[in-house]
From Swiss-Prot:
Pathway: Amino-acid biosynthesis; ergothioneine biosynthesis. The keyword Lyase applies. This is Probable hercynylcysteine sulfoxide lyase. Probably catalyzes the conversion of hercynylcysteine sulfoxide to ergothioneine. Ergothioneine is an antioxidant that protects mycobacteria from oxidative stress. Keywords: Lyase, Pyridoxal phosphate. Its cofactor is pyridoxal 5'-phosphate. GO terms for biological process: ergothioneine biosynthesis from histidine via gamma-glutamyl-hercynylcysteine sulfoxide. Coiled coil: none annotated. It holds the Pfam family Aminotran_5. Its EC number is 4.4.-.-. The keyword Lyase applies. InterPro entries: Aminotrans_V_dom, EgtE, PyrdxlP-dep_Trfase, PyrdxlP-dep_Trfase_major, PyrdxlP-dep_Trfase_small. GO terms for molecular function: hercynylcysteine sulfoxide lyase activity (ergothioneine-forming).
Amino acid sequence: MRRSGANSPAGDSLADRWRAARPPVAGLHLDSAACSRQSFAALDAAAQHARHEAEVGGYVAAEAAAAVLDAGRAAVAALSGLPDAEVVFTTGSLHALDLLLGSWPGENRTLACLPGEYGPNLAVMAAHGFDVRPLPTLQDGRVALDDAAFMLADDPPDLVHLTVVASHRGVAQPLAMVAQLCTELKLPLVVDAAQGLGHVDCAVGADVTYASSRKWIAGPRGVGVLAVRPELMERLRARLPAPDWMPPLTVAQQLGFGEANVAARVGFSVALGEHLACGPQAIRARLAELGDIARTVLADVSGWRVVEAVDEPSAITTLAPIDGADPAAVRAWLLSQRRIVTTYAGVERAPLELPAPVLRISPHVDNTADDLDAFAEALVAATAATSGER
């Protein structure tokens, strides 16, 4: 059964508005957790800035874009629940984590994170010498709060790192409760909101929130953001500190120093403004609604098991193969034969937890129940068509 509000006027209005703001889709896009479709406004803003660079020079154009970029920073701070955060643009989420951990103060380097931590994040943590301690979890991968409280109080790490929604599974972590726990224990909380910003509520005032432009906010690729509580920012020690002969730079300025694609940052800032204009709460509700519909229509597709509970408040649906279905072959068939864009997620996404590859879909608010019905039918065909390729 579909959720009763699946085709509600409010949902249709948001879907229509989102769809009209973008170029027509070439096929069926169910891959926003990888990269959403940009709007005309974001595309035009980036292009106009690039043209302005050609007209007046890159540095003059960057100065002219300062107000737009400041608005983008303010939007990120608001969506993180930390209005006074110092916000640094990066090239993506992984770059943001690299900047943060490479600048972390003190000699002690321990952090607690989920067993399902994103593989590349684990690589960055190891590169910066952090000892990783797994947080206790429930069967569905959600943090076990009571057990985590005992663990963190008994042997506090230097920081807690929480990926609010994983790359390999659409379970939303209880972020607000973890934030409260970390506040009570006086532990810095770092939130990986790559899959969270614009998708689930991240406004909990964590000490650090970092995210990507290209996913649920639907901005350009190659841009990310690092938002840090001012008190913590002052404690960070940039890997490349400003030399004595340079003018004084704040820590945030040191972290953000270097070459940048300002046009992409402008596009990201515009996309953030569009997200706020559409209403973050309405977007979150619509995304959760689509996740509910997807899991319902896919529950009985032979050869696959839906990983998330039907009412999980996220738009991501993960399909684990059973009876020998091949996620990589199915993903390729869906793209080549039906122009349906999905994600094949290998075990490297979560090397400490994911036992086998999975198939992931992630609709945005412009997708419909009919789209998800069409995907279910195509999945049946793809599974049958690729069954002999094993």
